[in-house]
Amino acid sequence: MGICVSKPSPEPDLHNHHTSIPVNDTSLPPQDNSIPPKDIAIPAQDNNKPPGKKSPFLPFYSPSPAHFLFSKKSPAVGSPAAGSSNSTPKRLFPFPPPSPAKHIKAAWARRHGSVKPNEAAIPENNEVDGGAGLDKSFGFSKKFGSKFEVGEEVGRGHFGYTCRAKFKKGEFKGQDVAVKVIPKAKMTTAIAIEDVRREVKILRALTGHNNLVQFYDAFEDHTNVYVVMELCEGGELLDRILSRGGKYTEDDAKAVMIQILNVVAFCHLQGVVHRDLKPENFLFKSKDEDSQLKAIDFGLSDYVKPDERLNDIVGSAYYVAPEVLHRSYSTEADVWSIGVISYILLCGSRPFWARTESGIFRAVLKANLSFDEPPWPSVSSEAKDFVKRLLNKDPRKRMTAAQALCHSWIKNSNDIKFPLDILVFKLMKVYMRSSPLRKAALRALSKTLTVDELFYLKEQFVLLEPTKNGTISLENIKQALMRNSTDAMKDSRVLDLLVSLNALQYRRMDFEEFCAAALSVHQLEALDRWEQHARCAYDLFEKDGNRAIMIEELASELGLGPSIPVHAVLHDWIRHTDGKLSFLGYVKLLHGVSTRAIAKAQ
């Protein structure tokens, strides 16, 4: 696991860009961001535990940092400043030290019940200190001993240890598995207990995907919880990267990215955000070069609804998304982490680097990607565009995992399957509730899309299995969701999604309207040719859709209430010559009225 700062605020402040970064922290001069033998984990250290045996191929092994590689002390506050946080750091230093930020250590320790006196943090309102009085009964089967023969301990983490084991009987008799053993004595807070309960629930719900480590069952007794998983003996993705000299060829990187994107798109469709994606959390099933890749370690994962935002800071420093640090994020944060992995695969270095966690966070928030240093000049323009669109700091402009599989760099690979994208239904919901004027504006914009830009929308439309006359209805969406959902999602999320699209119950939608409904304006805005798209779309809108409109009528179409100063907000949306929408008004209509614009007008 990575960092965990669990102090969510009721109302996340999107404008506070330094929530987790001590303002007086500084970093070193430009250093090497090349990937070291092991990534830096940031949990609090437990000095009373013996070091675990190294086992890089088990799903739950969480290695401690290699202390012999790093200096013992963090740099003092006020140490020499780092290179500019506005550009990707250069690669001049062989490895970064683990130096955890103190506030993160304290929060991790508090979450898992091992706070040291000098690191104690203020308990959250609903948090219980100590293990006394906590209900540590999970309702799991108590027959672990009768079903499994336990082998040697092969790894020890901060919250448990891992053993090899074998099935004693049944259809899997003699099969090796990995067993994560979590001592109940370690569960000294209500949060820690809930973490275990949620992890098992998520593993049980997601099991079955080819690129996800298989979950067999969970057991418990008076002292431990036992989570039985598939044994993966091919090693970590990180180890494969290092064995190849630090980077992959483009073709080999594509093969890895397709598997990662497939499983993450699957998780997101089921309403699960992983929150700790990194090379260490992907294992190969076997040592074969073409072995399947498996996602592991759902200890920080959580459920998230389509319109919900999470606000607790979790993950691993090098892979954490900017919006996580802003305490307002969703599934897009996983895509950022995939972008970091793709950057590492293609060049062997991390895109954001500093000597401390707070320095890394500052780089994540402020640094701009650079593709000037070797080997980037020799990397294809499609691959660089792929990485850029995953590492866009604005989560609204970032590709989804399903969209990334439709990117020109990847989409022509062999045996690729395009998954259903939850974003389509979120955008359709907004479209169905939009005014006729905004729908006309979106239809004009959709007519400017290129063949490559239409590819993703065509694949999504095909997955909805339209009728022979090329239309879809609510029933098509229902059947598509049922085909692509786990049993857990069928029971919980499908109905909610269908209710939000209830307007399609009484009408049908053709592909042309679907493109307008499922089009992301923000993602188009991230493209270099956005200005061209917008100008062409406005010309089309002028011919078919634009009309004279009063500010009051426009405010009504946009759903602005009487308390909003509509003339101050919308005065530049309308041309004074003929009362029609201006180009600026058209572009703003595509986005809708922002709360920032309203606040500024007030």
Swiss-Prot record:
Active site: D276 (proton acceptor)
Keyword Zinc: no
Protein kinase domain boundaries: 148-410
Keywords: ATP-binding, Kinase, Nucleotide-binding, Repeat, Serine/threonine-protein kinase, Transferase
Annotated Pfam families: Pkinase
InterPro entries for this protein: CDPK_Ser/Thr_kinases, EF-hand-dom_pair, Kinase-like_dom_sf, Prot_kinase_dom, Protein_kinase_ATP_BS, Ser/Thr_kinase_AS
EC number: 2.7.11.1
Binding-site positions, ATP: V154, G155, R156, G157, H158, F159, G160, Y161, T162, K180
UniProt cross-references to SUPFAM superfamilies, sorted A to Z: EF-hand, Protein kinase-like (PK-like)
Domain notes: All EF-hand domains seem to be non-functional.
Domain (EF-hand) ranges: 451-486, 487-527, 528-563, 564-602
Catalytic activity annotation: L-seryl-[protein] + ATP = O-phospho-L-seryl-[protein] + ADP + H(+); L-threonyl-[protein] + ATP = O-phospho-L-threonyl-[protein] + ADP + H(+)
Region (3 X 7 AA tandem repeats of S-[LI]-P-X-X-D-X): 20-40
Protein name from the UniProt record: CDPK-related protein kinase
Ranges of Polar residues composition bias in the record: 19-34
Family that this chain belongs to: Belongs to the protein kinase superfamily. CAMK Ser/Thr protein kinase family. CaMK subfamily.
Residue numbers spanned by region Disordered: 1-59
Repeat (Sequence) residue spans along the chain: 20-26, 27-33, 34-40
Protein's UniProt keywords contain Repeat: yes
MF term (GO), any: ATP binding
